[in-house]
């Protein structure tokens, strides 16, 4: 009888050991699966971060993939110069050379067909080049905070000669700079440091936000993107609303949401390069009238960081991991994402009882 009990006990012990082993393996597998949600207001750089993940973790864009972005580069370039020329009328800025008015008419006559066909014909590129060289156009570009303009406008317009070549193939940097409004949800998968990442990029404009909700379940971490350089801009969809204020409002609702009590929140204060250039001539008081510090990068950026971090109502239990980023700079994003991954690994192991 004793032998039978002993055999049963042994079998039960083996089963228990196997269950423990399976639970541990499941725990380790769960710890290796990372679901990242990219959130933030429109034009904060979320899609650029996704493109960087492809460049850093998936061997980048092939020549054929780059070629497919050519029409987007052309469209962004045409849309940018058109936005500047249209704004000249509203801001009552004249062309320095009166003959540029003919070029402006040509621009509007040729642009529609060019965009539809995804091309940049030589006559149109010459028109754009002459317009961009005009002092009146440059004066209007200098006042771009007063109207809606792509961040990549100067990048493409300054490089028009290269872009207009008949054999032009966009570079990785050209692809990073392209702007296409994200509608719906874009999912990206990659592996890094033995972790399997699923990254979800969702549209930031107000009309897109209702599509976020079903992505929330089982999220490991949220990367919330803020355009630092948007402190003196208004929304494309609501010209009464300051973009930074909108971003803060959105961050408040995400950071303090009951869904995300146990979710790591990583704050990317993005477009630091544009902010550093802009802060010298556009004061932070435009956005924060109470600000009394210097209009210098370090002090102003630190102030914005504290404004966002102060929105966290659970400081005793919830930490915000803040990074200053330039989403178009691959080395910077690589460095920051490395640090972010270490935080995720540590928190994941803790949650699975393995740390």
Curated annotation (Swiss-Prot):
SMART domains: G_alpha. Residues 35-48 are annotated as: G1 motif. Residues 32-355 form the G-alpha domain. GTP binds at residues 40-47, 176-182, 201-205, 270-273, 327. InterPro entries: Gprotein_alpha_I (IPR001408), Gprotein_alpha_su (IPR001019), GproteinA_insert (IPR011025), P-loop_NTPase (IPR027417). Residues 325-330 are annotated as: G5 motif. GO terms for biological process: adenylate cyclase-inhibiting G protein-coupled receptor signaling pathway; cell division; cell population proliferation; G protein-coupled acetylcholine receptor signaling pathway; G protein-coupled adenosine receptor signaling pathway; gamma-aminobutyric acid signaling pathway; modulation of chemical synaptic transmission; positive regulation of cell population proliferation. Transmembrane segments: none annotated. Residues 266-273 are annotated as: G4 motif. Residues 197-206 are annotated as: G3 motif. Guanine nucleotide-binding proteins (G proteins) are involved as modulators or transducers in various transmembrane signaling systems. The G(i) proteins are involved in hormonal regulation of adenylate cyclase: they inhibit the cyclase in response to beta-adrenergic stimuli. May play a role in cell division. G proteins are composed of 3 units; alpha, beta and gamma. The alpha chain contains the guanine nucleotide binding site. In this context, interacts with GNB2. Interacts with UNC5B. Interacts with GPSM1. Interacts with RGS12 and RGS14. Interacts (inactive GDP-bound form) with NUCB1 (via GBA motif); the interaction leads to activation of GNAI3. Interacts (inactive GDP-bound form) with CCDC88C/DAPLE (via GBA motif). Interacts (inactive GDP-bound form) with CCDC8A/GIV (via GBA motif). Interacts with CXCR1 and CXCR2. Belongs to the G-alpha family. G(i/o/t/z) subfamily. This is Guanine nucleotide-binding protein G(i) subunit alpha-2. It comes from Canis lupus familiaris (Dog).
């Amino acid at each position: 009888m004793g032998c039978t009990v002993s055999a049963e006990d042994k079998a039960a012990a083996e089963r228990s050991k196997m269950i423990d082993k399976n639970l541990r393996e499941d725990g380790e597998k769960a710890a290796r699966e990372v679901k990242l949600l990219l959130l933030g207001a429109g034009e904060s750089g979320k899609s650029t971060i996704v493109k960087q993940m492809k460049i850093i973790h998936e061997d980048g864009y092939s020549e054929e993939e780059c070629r497919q972005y050519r029409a987007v580069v052309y469209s962004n370039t045409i849309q940018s110069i058109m936005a500047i020329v249209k704004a000249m009328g509203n801001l009552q800025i004249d062309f320095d050379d009166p003959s540029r008015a003919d070029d402006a008419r040509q621009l509007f006559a040729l642009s529609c067909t060019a965009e539809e066909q995804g091309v940049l014909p030589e006559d149109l590129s010459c028109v754009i080049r002459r317009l961009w060289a005009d002092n009146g156009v440059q004066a209007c570009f200098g006042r771009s905070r007063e109207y809606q303009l792509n961040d990549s406008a100067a990048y493409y317009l300054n490089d028009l000669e290269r872009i207009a070549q008949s054999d032009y193939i966009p570079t990785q940097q050209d692809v990073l700079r392209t702007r296409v409004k994200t509608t719906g949800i874009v999912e990206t998968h990659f592996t890094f440091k033995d972790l399997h990442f699923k990254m979800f990029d969702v549209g930031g404009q107000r009309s897109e936000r209702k599509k976020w909700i079903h992505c929330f379940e089982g999220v490991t971490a949220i990367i919330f993107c803020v355009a630092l350089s948007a402190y003196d801009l208004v929304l494309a969809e609501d010209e009464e609303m300051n973009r930074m204020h909108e971003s803060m409002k959105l961050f408040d609702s995400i950071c303090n949401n009951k869904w995300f009590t146990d979710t790591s929140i990583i704050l990317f204060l993005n477009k630091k390069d544009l902010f550093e250039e802009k802060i010298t001539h556009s004061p932070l008081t435009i956005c924060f009238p109470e600000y009394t510090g210097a209009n210098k990068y370090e002090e102003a950026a630190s102030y914005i960081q504290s404004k966002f971090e102060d929105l966290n109502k659970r400081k005793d239990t919830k930490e915000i991991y803040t990074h200053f980023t330039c989403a178009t700079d691959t080395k910077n994003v690589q460095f920051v994402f490395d640090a972010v991954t270490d935080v995720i690994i540590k928190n994941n192991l803790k949650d699975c009882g393995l740390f």
